Amino acid sequence: MKALIPKQHGAWAMLLIPFLLGMVKGGPVIWHIPLFLGWLFLYLAVYPVTLALKKKQSKPYQKWMCYYGFPTCCFLMISVFHKPPLIWVGVSLLPLFLIHMYFARRKNERALLNDVAGVLFFCSGGFASCWLGMGTLDGWAWFIFLQSALFFIGSSFYVKSVIRERKNRAFAYWSWGYHLLLPFLSALFGAGWAFLAFIPSSLRAWFFHGRDWPVKTIGILEIVNACFFLAVMCLFITR
């Protein structure tokens, strides 16, 4: 039986990088294991739900909802049992999940608003991870959430502008404008010299637009860019 696993590489980066940043800043603890496993299985569980809504038939995907949903509940319950306030992170994710379900039902899950909702959903993993490691909620959890959100919203803009919206000049201008502001927004939210983590994102949005590259090449470059972002942010938050 072939596992039903999402194939979006960008989503995997959004799943991992904010969580890792939160763990690096907060300090790794044993409770990060169930939290990460719960986070991972939650991501996997959303995929069959999305397909069921998109194709308007749930039966082919019910077993995968159970396979992924059961461990999701178990691992996240362990995390919440250890730190009950984490339940509020889950509550805050509900509107974002409903936005995703709405666009999946309309077979328009590539809409920019849905992308932004997805980015905020994933970046909350860094918020929870930092909170869990530090033991208290402080500005660093918000910092990791905001910086990760800025980065991955930019990635969504860029990828959409060179693939699905490559012939949409207006969308290109929106992407260029966002990436022009991106380093300044990062600094505004407290990044200091770590705004440098966003420079490659801005440069590739301006100079790589219009290149007739295969999707695989674009994906590889995005992974490299995400690794650079992770490295710079790790240096900044551990200084």
Curated annotation (Swiss-Prot):
One Pfam family of this chain: YwiC
GO cellular component terms attached to this protein's record: plasma membrane
Location (main, coarse): membrane
Keywords: Cell membrane, Membrane, Transmembrane, Transmembrane helix
Compartments where found: Cell membrane
Family (UniProt): To H.influenzae HI_1626.
Gene source species: Bacillus subtilis (strain 168)
TM helices/strands, residue ranges: 4-24, 29-49, 61-81, 84-104, 116-136, 139-159, 180-200, 218-238
Protein name, entry field: Uncharacterized protein YwiC
UniProt topology in membrane: Multi-pass membrane protein
